[in-house]
Amino acid sequence: MKKIVIIDHFSQTPDEPGNNRFLYLAQMLCEIGCQVEIITTDFSHKAKKTRQTDMERLRELPYGFTMLPEPGYPKNVCLTRFYSHYVLGKNLQKYLKTISKPDLIYAAIPSLDAAGAAAAYCKKQNIPFVIDIQDLWPEAFKLVFHIPVLSDLIFAPMTAQANRIYRQADKIVAVSETYKNRGLKSCKKDKEGLCVYLGTDLAKFDESAAGIAVDKPADQLWIAYAGTLGHSYNIEIVLDALNLLPDDMASKVVFKVFGDGPLMERFQAYAQKCKVKVDFLGRLDYGSMTAYLKHSDIAVNPIVKGAAQSIINKHADYAAAGLPVVSTQECPEYRMLLEQYGCGINCDPENPKQVADALQKLLQKEAMRHEMGFNSRKMAQERFDRAHTYQGILAEIEKLVR
């Protein structure tokens, strides 16, 4: 029996809401006969507090689930966070010395501290090291601290750290072609890499949505946003666009916002000026969110100019729900997917009028919504269904541990 260790700094516990890639992968590895342990932190990045976890439930899992101590931090962007990650990395180094040698380590990036500790351990023990790039660090931080030249100098140590990790990987896996190509620039051992979108399990998505009743008035049209309410996401451009809709149309529209984050209160205050009804529903359990998305009419993907995001969770959820998407994301990869499948409208990230025109077109034309929605679901089946796409990850792991 091959022993696989998965290191995911920002994992979720099974009793927390979400649709985590690594829990799903751990389950798949167990089903093919591997012994699996997930190593993460006892600090919840989303809740910004130490986890209160049902340990009995953890013991019932088919894989091990280890939470290492981390001091924590109050905000996504603060110096305390970097120190907290440093401590977690040191605790991971110590913990890896106590376990029996695994056959392979599969580590998520970010964080760089956790992945760096894993890289050092794999080099010393001469075992295969696979990284799965979920986000680009320090590129994501440069969006917040965007000062030409100075930002590059400040984040130079993180860039060097990321390059060292990429260089050592035996295999680069990533959630987008964009991220994969960044890793391959520095990688010495892997020249091809593997792009596997975060995705979702379509069968489970449909089952979850079908099991929850949603009360939607027949005369309403719902525009949905699902995800973090943070610096990379421009909810305000959607609100500005909604204010540009004709009054008779605006009266039928409800903007449903699913999620929370550091800018939630700011967005809620801004929404007070919106002539369209706005519902902030907070972070729902994944099943409830799927049901609401299935009952929605249009999805919005309002990502700010210059953001590092590529293919992300909400893309899979919108596609699985069969929703047409109005997107302000600059990432060529996602823009191309929307155009290739004919399932959305790309807009300028700083042009509310363009967003309003796109929304108005879809709100007016039911046939267009249905056609784009059908195409969106087709994209989910072909590009985002984990039951099929994650087989590629399993194949790479099996190849490395033979």
Where do the language-model regions lie?
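Nucleotide-activated donor-binding/catalytic signature segment of Leloir-type glycosyltransferases, i.e.
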Residues: 250, 265-290
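Membrane-proximal helix-turn-helix segments that form the acceptor-binding/catalytic region
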Residues: 93-94, 116, 120-124, 152-172
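Nucleotide-sugar-dependent
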Residues: 233, 285-292, 299-319, 326-336
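Conserved donor-binding/catalytic core segment of Leloir-type glycosyltransferases
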Residues: 5, 215-243, 256
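Carbohydrate-associated surface elements
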Residues: 178, 199
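N-terminal subdomain of nucleotide-sugar transferases
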Residues: 1-60, 198, 240-247
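A short, well-ordered alpha-helix in the C-terminal region of glycosyltransferases
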Residues: 361, 368-383
